[in-house]
Amino acid sequence: MPAEAGREIVVAKVIEARAFCNNEVAYLAWKTDGKIKDCLGFMITRINLDTGERRLLPAWVAFDTQSNPDWEAQDTSVWPIQKFSWRDLTLRRSRDTLQVRAPFRAKYEIVPVGPEAPGRAAVPPSPTAQPGKYKGTPIPMFVCGEAGETNEFSVTDNFGDVSAFFNNGILSTQNLRKQLETPDGKAPTKPQIDAHIKKPGDPIRTFLTGDVLPALKSMFARAEQEDGTLHLALYELEDTELVDLLVQNQARLNLILSTAGSKTTKAKPAGMAAAAKTMVKRSKLVKKATKKKSIATMAKKSAKKLSAAKKTGAAKKAAGKAVKKTKKSSAAKPKNVTVWDVTNAAARAKLSALMGSRLQNRMFNNSAHIGHNKFAVLLDRNGKPIVVWSGSTNWTKTGLCAQSNNTIIIESDAVAKAYFDYWTRLHADKLPVPKPLSAPLGSDQGPALRTADATPNSTTLDKGKTKIDLWYSPNTPKTGTPKNRTVPPDLQFVFSLMKQAKDAIFFLVFNPGRTDPEGEDVNTVVSAGIDFGRLDPDLTVFGAISDPTALPGFVAPPKDQPRDEPKIPPPAIFSPEGVPNVLMIRAAAIKDLIGDFQRELLSAGHAIIHDKIVVIDPMSETDCVVITGSHNLGFKASYANDENMLVLRGNRPLALAYTTHVLDIYDHYKFRAVLEQQTRDIMLKGKPPPKRPTGKGFLQTTDKWQDPYISGEKGKELAYFLR
């Protein structure tokens, strides 16, 4: 952080500050020329350069002599920021309105503030402060150092031929608790949030989807404008609003819809007649002979030795087995019965009735393979591919609202043609269609598709300034899991770019696969990041992971653990010993009361962080890289799934937009991961879980909060952005 650690300066100042953003959030970082005497934090003002409007950023965390039990917003003139970085979560939309600010240019002013002292000017009264809305004695703020300003930046979703959009799909927030009017001491529930996110136009749904839903809806307006057709390949399709849009525009659609979701239940023993029925039906000969007979009658006749004239030897064998089964009737053990495609079944039926053969059922109906794509290609009225929509967002209410996700739109004939060619290959790679559609299958992709997918499509955007490589899956020769995991071609390319990183690698992943904590298995971006971070101590590797099993060091809880014993949480933070430049955290929520923070809801489904993003050297004009798409960035995605992955190089504004999203998610969950890791560490020592987490959850009333930043213990990632 500051140039000379530990040096106090009476007249101190912010010597450098930088800011960058995406369509939802801005990230800013700054440094001073030393520890600022008496500094209680920084007052931050966003300046709209188009209108001249100055707006203090909101703040919710009170000083430790105060309390904000109702989570009412003040601003940073009341409760300053006790960090050297911040996220402006109200960049385009405030918490109390659905109004979205149009694209604009902005910068930030950062002012050190502290208590009254000779020569210090008082902070002027602010219209966004709310005196009386919190408990405790107010602490008037005075300017205690020279202000600094960030660079100017554009608030936009457009980055040349590419547009990028990010949702607000974090549920574990105090703001959501407040909107849901959750009682103190309780966490919001899944039914509570589900009631809002499934309802088109609901304010909570609208906020959580951000610009991702409008971006997806824009494809239909564009198709009408072009009088064109849309070719889509989707994994999950359940959201009512999006399904209705498909229905309304079905005449323009060609859809490949994969299997999504399954439900396994234990079947009850069905007695003598049902047992006989099950076994008899498995023999075609017996089935033919029983077309006009009840199953119960067949069971009785099979017990009396069916004559050879009526049955073949094979039928006798089957009937004999049926008799043995009927003898056990009530003692028969329940069997697991799996019903497939529970997520898509309703939408599939509705669209199939309208679209006929223009809807292809891509039914894997097994857990080994999934059609994981979520993309659309627009063809103009002449059949020419012109635009692509892709990203990580599934077409479900949770994909839109209850997970972190992104959507990317690319205006390029070459890119659109590559995606349409892939769509055509998928369509030609026909899978068996089970009857009923929910029945189990062992389907996988064919060799022609795999061979074609092993070669990427490469082109340029923005008149040659942006390079783009397009990879599709599956791209390994074999359908099954190979014994020796040779790195697939798409991951080889990704790892080669990570290896070339000069300064930083940032990532967000759902579950790329289990990761060896030693980083020896370079089949996921997580393990590759560990490897490259070990090799280069100057390489910053930061990331957030959704699934606890994908965080290095995960240990499954004992299966025989008594139910009444408190469960030790899985690891929440990972940094290899002696490698502080590598830090990975997993998604977590506040489970215990800390300060004014109340319990939170972590998820409304399985995924929490659903992005599949790697950003390399985002500050570089020429070497920056963005990797995105549907690919989970691990081995299984390459050999088992239908996937698409985009690798964009040389577009710095785009790279910084994706970096902002990564840092937004990472910063949010890091605080919560630290709390959960503290609980884990205590319980591993055989002690009971703490009644309250370590840490007070309030702002400090002295300048000591700066010390860990001055020493370098905190804020390691800031050095990269401020060099």
Residue spans for each PLM region:
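Interdomain helical connector at the RecA1-RecA2 junction of SF1/SF2 helicase-like NTPases
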Residues: 419-422
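PLD/PLD-like phosphodiesterase catalytic module centered on the HKD motif
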Residues: 2-199, 213, 217, 224, ...
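Catalytic cores of large soluble enzymes that bind and process phosphate-bearing ligands
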Residues: 204, 208, 411, 486, ...
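A short, well-structured juxtamembrane/interface segment
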Residues: 208-221, 488-491
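Short, contiguous, well-ordered secondary-structure segments
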Residues: 217-223, 227-229, 494-504
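Active-site cores of enzymes that catalyze phosphoryl transfer or operate on phosphate-rich substrates
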Residues: 156-200, 208-209, 425-487
